[in-house]
Amino acid sequence: MGKYLTSPPNLTGMPPGVPYIIGNEAAERFSYYGMKSVLTVFMAHYILNQSGVLAPMNENESYMYTHLFVFGVYFLPVLGAILADGFIGKYWTILSLSIVYCLGNLTLACMATSWGIAIGQRMMLLIGLIMICLGAGGIKPCVSANVGDQFGESNKHLLSKMFGWFYFSINAGSFISSILCPWFLANPKWGPGWAFGIPGIAMLIATLFFWGGRNKMVHVPPAGLGYLKQTFSKEGILTLARIAMVFFFILFFWGLWGMSNGAEWTLQAEKMNLHWMGLNLIAAQVQTANPILILIFIPIVNYILYPAIDKVFTLTPLRKIGIGLFITAFSFVVIVMIQGWIDAGQKPSINWQLLAYTILTLGEAMVSITGLEFAYTQSPNSMKSSVMALWLLTVASGEGFVALVNKWILGGGQKVSAYQYFTFFTWLMVGAAVVFTIVACFYNYRTHLQSQLTADEVATEPILHGGTPS
């Protein structure tokens, strides 16, 4: 690792490694969201048995497996963080697990082959999703922490903008793939093989692009076994607990957000009038409203909304998140209204769900982007990936919670209408937002950035006290 930079250079502009990391993230997110955009629909409408006969899952079963998959993707960052911070560093963790990720996508693409059907599409689906969980989950905390590692004191003023562009790249990739992959799935000429194969090609490109920037990036060395000792020390646990107290309430946001991304909202859209501006949309394409809107909202909230609110009261990161949680709850009020009309035998316009996406995406812009920056800046230097994993664990917990609710409905034979289902989650979000607002009032900020030191100086720096507290 001696040939690589191990601490941020003294720059006032954007670090040279950032474009490679952001480009990699755009392609990887294209892969992930493209695959996920068709996953629930594939299970509910396209999956075959070993005889090649259509054998779809029911709606709640497909919901449950989708949420369990996302739970795995966002739970496994814990292992990726330990591997990166403690043993092989962020770069090698990302590169090695990206290969596993590619193999998982290849497995899903092969489900449509004759031998894939003979083995069993459910078995192939399980193997592929487990590999994607390992790959996508393992690299998740490392990528966002790695991009933050490129910055030091001299260019820390660009960190907030960088996380905005980082999130922009996520949604640019998501937007394109969420249009393409449902189209491939719905077109008999292409079908599931291409719908899952295109994301696999994108992941291969992401891996090669990241490898191509290896000499431009800062490679912060792992802390070794001392990382585990310090992380699980009393002080390390208190650090994680202090941040986790804030993160706990955000899991409810991610649980609700996950419903809009190829799951419950998509199946609701199938029961709506999908004619929009002269186009006949596919239900799975409606979710592309989210990445389109996030690309619009990122500059609006950063350059218009936040400065305007700041004139009324100081807009701290946790206040941004709190406002975003209340906005998210309001988006589900619209979903409840839509479901009421559907249950009454009507076929409401998809414009109503697009309104819900607009409100939800505004909430996301305030919660998710702010949360990424908060997770990075509030974590000690040797624990960047670990705290990012804790942030991602809120996504896993949210998805896991929703999966458990669906499991309870399935296993208990409960007769819960979709209207009652969405109403429950609406009130849950309101309650979480209220309690979060109270808890956030007691949080004390402490910011840490990577020191612009030599490799030897970094090696002698105390593990839990790196960076510049502010």
Predicted regions and their residues:
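Intracellular loop-helix junctions on the cytosolic face of multi-pass helical membrane proteins
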Residues: M1-G23, F151-S160, G164, S169, ...
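Hydrophobic core of transmembrane alpha-helices in multi-pass small-molecule transporters
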Residues: A26, C102-G104, A118-I139, I338, ...
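A gly/Pro-rich, aromatic-decorated transmembrane alpha-helix motif that marks the paired
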Residues: S37, F75-I82, A109-C110, N171-N187, ...
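Central cavity-lining transmembrane alpha-helices of secondary-active solute carriers
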Residues: M64-D85, A172-F175, T288-Y303, S397-G400
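C-terminal ends and interior cores of transmembrane alpha-helices
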Residues: L97-G120, F326-G345
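Intracellular juxtamembrane helix-capping segments at the cytosolic ends
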Residues: A136-S154, E364-S379
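C-terminal transmembrane bundle
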Residues: N280, I294, Y303-S451
